[in-house]
């Protein structure tokens, strides 16, 4: 089995693949203080390490990247594929400094299975809108994610506190909890809807839209756009990149 690590700032979205399909997924908490040994103990609670024959790491957290590399080499006796400059991805990047482009953006783009221009909406710690055409990332929008927005209100105001991410029944709230939920959740929905129109004006062409990420189901239910969902898009991209880099 091939293990696919998508390391985000909040969690490590992990997939297991037979080389063709994504067979199983699970999440581990991202913790920059965890040692390779501790991550291995956590990993063993999900999968028998003896069945792992390949590893790929796509990460936006350098300390965790190093921990997973050490885990792979020490316990699995394997050399992992790591998405970094020089790794074959099949994705081109239109950017002032391509080295700054996150592994998550590249893996999402690599997960697409059609040649049509596509806007990928990835909802995580940060919300990313990634425009891909002809296997090239031509532009990206990054905004605070839902949980990050709630943390910001909780951490920087005296009277507003952290609330659960839920969709309130109406836009105009009548208590603090519903007011925050409306601002964060509906605010994200309206941001996406508004950016969709502005992006279409800018690119001057029709495009597919795919939504992914841990909170994609919540947003998809209420957004007024024709969108397809693919929760495993980033893992599919990691698998495609892995195949390009094994001998």
From Swiss-Prot:
It is found in: Cytoplasm. GO terms for molecular function: ATP binding; metal ion binding; pantothenate kinase activity. Its cofactor is NH4(+); K(+). The active site is at residue 104. Transmembrane segments: none annotated. The keyword Cell division does not apply. This is Type III pantothenate kinase. It comes from Acholeplasma laidlawii (strain PG-8A).
